[in-house]
Amino acid sequence: MSNTPIELKGSSFTLSVVHLHEAEPEVIRQALEDKIAQAPAFLKHAPVVINVSGLESPVNWPELHKIVTSTGLRIIGVSGCKDASLKVEIDRMGLPLLTEGKEKAVRPAPVEPATPSEPPQNANPITKTRLIDVPVRSGQRIYAPQCDLIVTSHVSAGAELIADGNIHVYGMMRGRALAGASGDREAQIFCTHLTAELVSIAGVYWLSDKIPAEFYGKAARLRLADNALTVQPLN
């Protein structure tokens, strides 16, 4: 037990950043509600950082703050603010001004105009899959929209995997796995070593202490049955 009443430790958290490109409150509200409706398990009541670098002065920050929080999102900080008067307004509301890591600029490849062609008859639909073949480290969040997510390496504690479809982890799974993020109740989670902090399918979740002991650290398959999470051996 520590001899001091408090202890400060460095840590990292995975947060979504909402980049605002429009200052009209009603436009922002509708856009946010549309995004939340696409992935409610991922975004509903989520803590977010608001990036205002794309907004032109003047900005009605109290009104923007009211609109964003009315959608259920929880603002924990603001980034990208260069306007001195706006900084004062944000500070008055008790929100920290944050500095984000710089992103590498990516030059878009030239796009050749496509030649119209007849679609093939009886073509099978292609289901996209996002493949990650490197370790997923603490603090990282990987999202696979409208597809399955496959990770062929380890997932560290504090990392987060999110997919609108299924999630497959062929390594040690210590982080959080959220399948069916857009509400697909048929989604499943497959792990070769299940030691997750949290598993969730379409918003129905277990914390690590709810995972049955006989499946902890084992190869397992999770899915919904009668609106409840179930787990079985992965053979």
From Swiss-Prot:
| Pfam families xref list | MinC_C, MinC_N
Q: Which domain of life is it from?
A: Bacteria
Q: Where are the transmembrane segments?
A: none
Family annotation (Gene3D superfamilies):
2.160.20.70, 3.30.70.260
Q: Does the keyword Cell division apply?
A: yes
According to the UniProt record, where is the region Disordered? 104-125
UniProtKB keywords: Cell cycle, Cell division, Septation
Which SUPFAM superfamilies does the record match to this protein?
Cell-division inhibitor MinC, C-terminal domain (SSF63848)
BP GO annotations: cell morphogenesis; division septum assembly; regulation of cell division; regulation of cell septum assembly
Quote the InterPro entries the UniProt record gives. Answer: CAP/MinC_C, MinC, MinC_C_sf, MinC_N, Septum_form_inhib_MinC_C
Tagged with keyword Protein biosynthesis: no
- Where do Pro residues bias regions lie? 110-119
Its function? Cell division inhibitor that blocks the formation of polar Z ring septums. Rapidly oscillates between the poles of the cell to destabilize FtsZ filaments that have formed before they mature into polar Z rings. Prevents FtsZ polymerization.
> Which NCBIfam families would you find in this protein's record?
minC
Q: Tell me, how does this one assemble?
A: Interacts with MinD and FtsZ.
Protein family per UniProt = Belongs to the MinC family.
**Name listed for the protein in its UniProt record:** Septum site-determining protein MinC
Record the organism.
Salmonella typhimurium (strain LT2 / SGSC1412 / ATCC 700720)
Annotated gene: minC
